[in-house]
């Protein structure tokens, strides 16, 4: 075994996926691994770099396709990817990097605001050595929340936003509204 593997962090919005991604990458940095993070370039809510909803910032490469950064990451042994659901080549990229001996950590939504799967992320599950599903707090009743609910009427899947556009909700509050 070459040590390469895939860690997948999934859950609804506001569940701490990006925070957990940053925590894991920092652990590897402390252990003297050469690390890089990649964020989806169309996500520019807070500025450059990888940002959490509570405004923590971490340096990151930006791309819309992961194959575009292949040449920039050859020297790194740990690759963190945020908003993995938006990368069309996430499955092939992660499998290739893990097979080359790299540790790949992906933070991603597992479902849309309509509770439909992000198929590229579901296709990563059988290829991953570790899968963690986080929950958030329901922004309506304050119980455990497993779903993201869009506040507006837009129907497009890729609309990037924060708590101005989305809420994390439990099953009861998702179905009841």
Curated annotation (Swiss-Prot):
Reaction equation(s) it catalyzes: thymidine + ATP = dTMP + ADP + H(+)
Statement: the UniProt record of this protein carries the keyword Membrane: no
Pfam families membership: TK
Gene3D superfamilies, A to Z: 3.30.60.20, P-loop containing nucleotide triphosphate hydrolases
EC class (word): transferase
One function term, GO molecular function aspect: ATP binding
InterPro entries: P-loop_NTPase, Thymidine_kinase, Thymidine_kinase_CS
Membrane-spanning segments: none
Keyword terms: ATP-binding, Disulfide bond, DNA synthesis, Kinase, Metal-binding, Nucleotide-binding, Transferase, Zinc
Residues binding ATP, per UniProt: 11-18
Protein's UniProt keywords contain Mitochondrion: no
EC numbers: 2.7.1.21
Residues reported in the UniProt entry to bind Zn(2+): 138, 141, 170, 173
Active site residues of this protein: 83 (proton acceptor)
A GO BP entry: DNA biosynthetic process
Positions that bind substrate: 113, 157-161
Family: Belongs to the thymidine kinase family.
PANTHER family given in the database record: THYMIDINE KINASE (PTHR11441), THYMIDINE KINASE, CYTOSOLIC (PTHR11441:SF0)
Quaternary assembly: Homotetramer. Two molecules of substrate bind to each enzyme tetramer.
Function comment: Phosphorylates thymidine and thymidine analogs, such as azidothymidine (AZT). Part of the salvage pathway for pyrimidine deoxyribonucleotide synthesis.
Descriptive protein name: Thymidine kinase
């Amino acid at each position: 075994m070459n040590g390469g593997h895939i860690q997948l962090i999934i859950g609804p919005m506001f569940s701490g996926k990006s925070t957990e991604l940053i925590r894991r990458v920092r652990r590897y940095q402390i252990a003297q691994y050469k690390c890089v993070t990649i964020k989806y370039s169309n996500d520019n809510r807070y500025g450059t770099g990888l940002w959490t909803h509570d405004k923590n910032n971490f340096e990151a490469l930006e791309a819309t396709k992961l194959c575009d950064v292949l040449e920039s990451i050859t020297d790194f042994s740990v690759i963190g990817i945020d908003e993995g659901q938006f990368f069309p080549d996430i499955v092939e990229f992660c499998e290739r990097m893990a097979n080359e001996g790299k540790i790949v950590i992906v933070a991603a939504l597992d479902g849309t605001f309509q509770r439909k799967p992000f198929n590229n992320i579901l296709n990563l599950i059988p290829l991953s050595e570790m899968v963690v599903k986080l929950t958030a707090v329901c922004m309506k009743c304050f119980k455990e929340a497993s779903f993201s609910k869009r506040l507006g009427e837009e129907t497009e899947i890729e609309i990037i936003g924060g708590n101005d556009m989305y809420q994390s909700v439990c099953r009861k509050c998702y179905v009841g509204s």
